[in-house]
Structures are given as structure tokens and as C-alpha cells.
């Protein structure tokens, strides 16, 4: 009995999307006899790699991190923005036990509910729709005092665009009949991440003491005064919002504070100022004992406070499932995409699983990859072919970075050269897989090189696309392709080709049915 394994190989051609139109399309311009032949003669289909199908907002372009997480997880993995959008749409947000408990504690004690966050439609650190939903939640649970502390954007949105958002919040408060905007300040102060604690202190004092450099009777008036001082949204100085006869919105013991940013990096510092007992960033004039301080997502593992949406741990990703079944696997790529075939493909797990080997090929040391479009693909292919021939691995996951890394340069001829280099590599890998009696899937994590010019502006298109990506089967099994697939169907497809059971956590479906 032979102990030599017949591997199943997943080759991810990074940034290799599918586009019918040949205009400004480096993939169709390239001479690719091998990929052309495989596409014509082997079972194939197109799969989605962007938008809702990978857990991103509708029509948003895919990216390598999200792509590899979905590839390895075998299920759609919702990004925080989309996860919250879905929760609000399905109304489960309004029953979130952490958010409701915080509001209920404040209501029971007759205290205030404070909401703070980046008040914009930017969708990078937060979204105004989530804040509007939080106001609604607090009002529905009987909160009488609801105070919004609006951090203004101007980075992920145009520099002077906050007025529309502030008007939305004012309208929501009018609709629910309680609460108001209590302060405005630019994200430059409230969301610093470079230990410039003097900035954070200004935001902290504004919220805890209701003291700022300026005061205005309403938020729009405060914003317009800032513009008159030549402060764009990002740099608006601490402004207390308080109409005539309105009570102070200073934070008091027993109040609840909910931080509505979902991205961690710029939320950590001000959160630590509120919750750390041994805080040393600046001398706090007032330390508030909140009934609850809630962070919307986990900003850091060492921040000890309530979290409404803890990170979803991904159980039984492809890598973990292989290890549980005592299978061997190899992850191989160049420096540029090594983290993607390891950490991201494993669902955010840094350590290799038992039986998982890794090979890192150094990417070339050039200023930009248009100067060496083949990158280190020859060495990568040599090592990959060696691994296939070794008979050591049940599964091999490989990423060729060229289509993406050279596509990002915007240099068309270089992208064509990159694609042609890949075709030569695929020829060698295909021969090795067939000689070993193995099987291979060729796909991509997102598009890039198929769209090298922006038709709207005429400028080089250096970003990813939201186009589908190819999926090709190479092997000796008689298989039938299933259309309508997505990246999260790849792991179940690999397991099916290996004759393995698919874990229940994987909701993706096999895209090649063995006949």
C-alpha cells in the first residue's frame, strides 16, 4: 500500500478577476495559453468575491484579508459594519443583551444614557445608522435623558460634511420625543491613536464635565461657528451644545455610556481614559463610575468592560478541520501574501495547526512591483512543485500575489507581464498535480488586473474590483460545476474532493459535484 499522498491543491491567483471586456484588461491582453486551455477544456465556473457574498456591504469591492477569511472559513464571515447592518435590519440589535442591560440600569436609577461615536456615514470606524438605532433603542426602553456626544469625521467623508449627519440626529431625537446632541468635537481629538493624550483629554473633559472651549445652542450652530473659525469637521474644537434652559449633560455616576465605534484602533485610547483604574495618559479631573460602559466591539482584549459584539470565533475552519482529522497541509506564498494563506485563511489564528507546514518565499526587494512583475513566482513554483511531488501533503494552499501587487501599480504593461509569468507557473503546477494523481482548484480572492483604467476618470485604476473570479478544476475525477458560488464555497469543495465530511459550521456548498 502506497503511503504517498495525492494532494488537493488550492492555487489562489491574487487579484485575478474575470471581465468580458478586453479594454484596459491586463488578463485578456496577456498571452495565457495554459489558462485559456484550462478554461475551455476543464470544468469551470465564476464565483462572487465581493459585496454581501463575502460579508461586506452591497457592491463593495473585495480585498485579500476578507477573501482569505471566507475561503478558509467555508461560510460567509460578516465584517463588523455588515454584521451590525444585518442585526439592525433584522431587529436583533434592539434585543442585544449588553446594550439593553446598560440602558435598563440607567433607566431604573433615573440616570442618563450617553452615546458617543464617530457621527458620520463613512462606514470605516462607525456608521451614523448604528447611532440612530441606538437612540431608538434607548428611547424604546424608557430612557428620558439620552445624550449624544458626536465625534465629527471629515476623513472618511468630505472635510465639511457633518451638517447632514447632525440634522439626522436632531430629527431622530424629535421623532422619539426625548434626548439631544450634547457635544461635538473633531475626531482629531476624540479618536487619537498616537498617544497624544492632550488631545484625548479635551474630549474627555468635554464629555465628563460638559466643559469645552466653545458653547452653542444647537449642534448645527456649533458646527457653523467652527467653520467660521476655519476648522473642518475633523478638527472642530470641543463644543458644548446646550440650549437655553437645558440641563447640563455632564456624565455622572450611575449613567450608562455606549461607544458606537466598531473599529478598534481609534477607539482604544479614549476608552482606556474612561475605564482603566490605573490610567496614566493624563490626570483625570473627574472619574465617572458608570452603571455600564459598553464598547460596541472588542477594542482590545485587556480592556475590561462590557462588549456588545465580541469577536466571533470561527470554529472548524478548513485548517482546523484538517488537523482534527490528522491530515497534513502546506501553506505557501511570497512575503506579500504569506499572512493571507496562514493567519487569515485560518480565521485569525496565528499558530499553525498540528500537521500544518508553512513555506515563506521572500518577495523581491524592489521599490514597486512593476519593476519586477514576475516577483518571486519562479522560486515559489519550484517549491510548490517539490511539495506536490513529495507525497507528504493531503492539501496545499498557495497564493501567487502578482495579479494584485502589480495591478496596484497601475502600470498596464507590467500587469500583462505578471499575468504571463503566472501562466508559465500554472503550466508547471498542472503537470505536477496530474503526475502525482492529485487534484487542483485554481481561483482568486478578488479582482484587480482585469481593470487597469478607470473609465470614468481615464486615470489608472489601482484598486480592487467587485467582479467575479474564475474557478477551475484540474484532476482525474468526473465532476460537474455548480454556478452561483462564492469564496466561502471553496473550503467545502476542497473537502468534498478529498472525500471528507463537511463540518456543520461550514454553510458553503461544494461547487464541483463528483459524478
Swiss-Prot record:
InterPro entries: Alkaline_phosphatase_core_sf, BPG-indep_PGM_N, Metalloenzyme, PGAM_B_sf, Pgm_bpd_ind. The keyword NADP does not apply. The keyword Signal does not apply. Mn(2+) 2 binds at residues 14, 64, 445-446. Mn(2+) 1 binds at residues 404, 408, 464. It catalyses: (2R)-2-phosphoglycerate = (2R)-3-phosphoglycerate. GO terms for molecular function: manganese ion binding; phosphoglycerate mutase activity. GO terms for biological process: glucose catabolic process; glycolytic process. SUPFAM superfamilies: 2,3-Bisphosphoglycerate-independent phosphoglycerate mutase, substrate-binding domain, Alkaline phosphatase-like. Gene3D superfamilies: Alkaline Phosphatase, subunit A (3.40.720.10), BPG-independent phosphoglycerate mutase, domain B (3.40.1450.10). One of its GO terms (cellular component) is cytosol. Binds 2 manganese ions per subunit. Belongs to the BPG-independent phosphoglycerate mutase family. PANTHER family: 2,3-BISPHOSPHOGLYCERATE-INDEPENDENT PHOSPHOGLYCERATE MUTASE (PTHR31637:SF0). Catalyzes the interconversion of 2-phosphoglycerate and 3-phosphoglycerate. This is 2,3-bisphosphoglycerate-independent phosphoglycerate mutase. It comes from Cronobacter sakazakii (strain ATCC BAA-894) (Enterobacter sakazakii).
Amino acid at each position: 500500500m502506497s503511503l504517498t499522498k495525492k494532494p488537493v491543491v488550492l492555487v489562489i491567483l491574487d487579484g485575478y478577476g474575470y471581465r468580458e471586456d478586453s479594454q484596459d484588461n491586463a488578463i485578456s491582453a496577456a498571452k495565457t495559453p495554459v489558462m485559456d486551455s484550462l478554461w475551455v477544456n476543464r470544468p469551470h465556473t465564476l464565483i462572487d468575491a465581493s459585496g454581501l457574498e463575502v460579508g461586506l456591504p452591497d457592491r463593495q469591492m473585495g480585498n485579500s484579508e476578507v477573501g482569505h477569511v471566507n475561503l478558509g472559513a467555508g461560510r460567509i464571515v460578516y465584517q463588523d459594519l455588515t454584521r451590525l447592518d444585518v442585526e439592525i435590519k433584522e431587529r436583533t440589535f434592539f434585543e442585544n443583551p449588553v446594550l439593553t442591560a446598560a440602558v435598563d440600569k440607567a433607566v431604573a436609577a433615573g440616570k442618563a444614557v450617553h452615546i458617543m461615536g464617530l457621527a458620520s456615514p463613512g462606514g470605516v470606524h462607525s456608521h451614523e445608522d448604528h447611532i440612530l438605532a441606538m437612540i431608538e433603542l434607548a428611547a424604546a426602553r424608557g430612557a428620558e435623558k439620552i445624550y449624544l456626544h458626536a465625534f465629527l469625521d471629515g476623513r472618511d467623508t468630505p472635510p465639511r460634511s457633518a451638517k447632514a449627519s447632525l440634522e439626522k440626529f436632531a430629527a431622530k431625537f424629535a421623532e422619539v420625543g426625548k434626548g439631544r446632541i450634547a457635544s461635538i468635537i473633531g475626531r482629531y481629538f476624540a479618536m487619537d491613536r498616537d498617544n497624544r493624550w492632550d488631545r484625548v483629554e479635551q474630549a474627555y473633559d468635554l464629555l465628563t464635565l460638559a466643559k469645552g472651549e466653545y458653547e452653542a445652542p444647537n449642534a448645527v450652530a456649533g458646527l457653523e461657528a467652527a467653520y467660521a473659525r476655519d476648522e473642518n469637521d475633523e478638527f472642530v474644537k470641543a463644543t458644548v451644545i446646550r440650549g437655553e434652559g437645558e440641563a447640563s449633560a455632564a456624565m455622572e455616576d450611575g449613567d450608562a455610556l455606549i461607544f458606537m465605534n466598531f473599529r478598534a484602533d481609534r477607539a482604544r485610547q479614549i476608552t482606556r481614559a474612561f475605564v482603566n483604574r490605573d490610567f496614566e495618559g493624563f490626570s483625570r479631573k473627574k472619574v465617572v463610575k458608570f452603571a455600564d460602559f459598553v464598547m460596541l466591539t472588542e477594542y482590545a482584549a485587556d480592556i475590561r468592560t462590557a462588549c456588545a459584539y465580541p469577536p466571533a470565533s470561527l470554529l472548524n475552519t478548513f485548517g482546523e478541520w484538517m488537523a482534527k482529522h490528522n491530515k497534513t497541509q502546506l501553506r505557501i506564498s511570497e512575503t506579500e501574501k504569506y499572512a493571507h494563506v496562514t493567519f487569515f485563511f485560518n480565521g485569525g489564528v496565528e499558530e499553525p495547526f498540528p500537521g500544518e507546514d508553512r513555506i515563506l518565499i521572500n518577495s523581491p526587494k524592489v521599490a514597486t512591483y512593476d519593476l519586477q512583475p514576475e516577483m518571486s513566482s519562479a522560486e515559489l513554483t519550484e517549491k510548490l512543485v517539490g511539495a506536490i511531488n513529495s507525497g507528504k501533503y493531503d492539501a496545499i494552499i498557495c497564493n501567487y500575489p502578482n495579479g494584485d501587487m502589480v495591478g496596484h501599480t497601475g502600470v498596464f504593461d507590467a500587469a500583462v507581464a505578471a499575468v504571463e509569468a503566472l501562466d508559465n507557473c500554472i503550466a508547471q503546477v498542472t503537470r505536477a498535480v496530474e503526475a502525482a494523481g492529485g487534484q487542483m482548484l485554481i481561483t482568486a480572492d478578488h479582482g484587480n488586473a482585469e481593470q487597469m483604467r478607470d473609465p470614468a476618470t481615464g486615470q489608472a485604476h489601482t484598486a480592487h474590483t467587485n467582479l467575479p473570479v474564475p474557478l477551475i478544476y484540474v484532476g482525474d475525477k468526473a465532476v460537474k460545476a455548480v454556478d452561483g458560488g462564492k469564496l466561502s464555497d471553496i473550503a467545502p469543495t476542497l473537502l468534498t474532493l478529498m472525500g471528507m465530511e463537511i463540518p456543520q459550521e461550514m454553510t458553503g456548498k461544494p461547487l464541483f459535484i463528483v459524478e
